[in-house]
UniProtKB/Swiss-Prot annotation:
Positions of region (Disordered): 1-21, 37-68, 100-138
Gene Ontology MF terms: DNA binding; DNA-binding transcription factor activity; transcription cis-regulatory region binding
GO BP terms, alphabetized: rDNA heterochromatin formation; regulation of DNA-templated transcription; termination of RNA polymerase I transcription
Protein source organism: Saccharomyces cerevisiae (strain ATCC 204508 / S288c)
Stated role: DNA-binding protein that recognizes sequence-specific replication termini (Ter sites) within rDNA. Binds to rDNA terminator elements and mediates efficient RNA polymerase I transcription termination. Required for rDNA silencing at the non-transcribed spacer 1 (NTS1). Promotes the association of SIR2 with NTS1 and contributes to maintenance of rDNA stability.
Record protein name field: RNA polymerase I termination factor
Recorded phenotype for the gene knockout or disruption: Decreases the association of SIR2 with NTS1, decreases rDNA stability and shortens replicative lifespan.
Disulfide bridge positions per record: none
Keywords, comma-separated and alphabetical: DNA-binding, Nucleus, Phosphoprotein, Repeat
Subcellular location: Nucleus, Nucleolus
Domain HTH myb-type per the UniProt entry, residue ranges: 340-391
DNA-binding region listed in the record: 367-389
Phosphothreonine, modified sites: 64
Basic residues bias spans: 37-56, 108-137
Amino acid sequence: MDSVSNLKSTNFQNNNDPKESVEEAVLRYVGVDLKNHIKKTKKKLKKQKKRKHGSKMSHEDEDTDMDWYLKTSGSKDLRKVDDIEPNSVAVAAVAAAYNSSMREKDKRSCHKKSSNSRSERKKHRKRKSSKERKAKIKMVLDPQLTTLDDGITTTAFLPDDLIAETAFDKYVDTEKAYLAKHPSKSLEVNEDDKENNFNNNSSTLVRIYTDLEGIPNDGSYIKRTPKIPEKDVKSDDLILAPEENNGDTALLRSDIVKASVIDGAITKSIGKKFTPSEENALDQFIEEYMKIRGLDRRQMCERIWSTDGVIRDGFWANISKVLPYRTRSSIYKHIRRKYHIFEQRGKWTPEEDQELARLCLEKEGHWTEVGKLLGRMPEDCRDRWRNYMKCGSKRGSKRWSKEEEELLTTVVNEMIEEAHQYQRMKALEAANKNDRYNQMYSRGPKGKRISDNPTFKDMINWTVVSERMSGTRSRIQCRYKWNKLVTDEAARSMLSIPVSERKWLLERLKQLPKTSYSNIDWNSIATYKPGYPRTGLELRLCYEQMREKIHDFKGRSTAEIIDSLLEQIN
């Protein structure tokens, strides 16, 4: 109403002011030169005559021109400009200008709303990514020692010999209860499940287990293992806090680049002992970190063992780049063992054994708490209890008898058969379910995926093996003995290997880069020839048997040994 009244007052002033022309009124109120506008209109009329009928104007022409007013009602023809009263033209100009300003205001309002919606979506994505980042940081940076507790094991930092949470001895009784409790819960497929199978690096005395990944259905003890992919990590992907973008950042970056090219970086180090060069690379990184942060050794150890989750400066993410071919889990456990905060390490006293036994009666499995009470590393408490004290006085320390070896073989084969039966049962039940339920049913409690191709570690829980041996042998005794039995059997099978296979093996070894001789991937060699019946363990034992025939082979390099063996065969 205000705009209409203003428009009327404008017309009234134009009619009663003889000194002011229509052009001046239009120019004064809307900033439009009417003469120039009329000229433009005439030119436009001429152009429209040349165009085809029915052409449409853009929205901008409709908003800024007065052609809409020049049209007669019910007709598409334009009236002549001279036939229109000047005051009416002024009114049309004012109305057009007002309409244009309102349209611009509407556009700005719509743009503001759309920008607000975009900003809301951006904020939502930011909040979502922040939550995901916090969840990752909670797992990656300063992961707690709950990996040692049997009840709350995390897959990211699972100890290699802690196999209590396997698919076969835990899932059978608990999965249906979990699905009954959460019938509508949809478990998303985690793309990192494949990588989690390789996070269990060997950190115990037995290293041969890297060659014993699986057992076939025919009951034999050996199976070829899949090739383990290397970590695809670039040294440039440093995660540094914002305040660290200075000269210290360049120093850390240079150390990581230097350490990434050490001998053995192109080979697999899964389950292998840290070499002196790797130790030096990690120590150098920590020394530089201490200088940058102004920390002494004690403070650095407390930083490494901190579990409050507050410190988020990318320490664990950056130090894992120092050895990019090793998993973060192995580096994490190795650093914590070396830079520990506990006073006691090494030999256990009888008093400590008694205290450990007393604590395990109440807190067995909660090794973080047990370690704090005893002032020892949680891993030490766990291993001491499971490997030496759990069996008590029943644990035998003498040479294994033939009956014990047969019982151990029987127990292991029974567990392997139980694992295969479980897999067949799962496959049969999953075939009768719909796709959505299949996805849920292929997982155990807490959403952990059950592998379609279970490995030997998935099948065998050495604590259960010790219990089925009536506790006469500890879990580590059973594990050691089984490794020896398998190795002896593989060595016997290699005594009759043909000369052609020996020659093929030596030629394959000769083709390898000399830098990889210190860490040969035997499983990769075994899978090189399709349908080859030998395993990586068998090939390694075959090479070691041939190597022993060379005098003073310990003083020769691997390349020299291979050349000498090829000369003997040829």
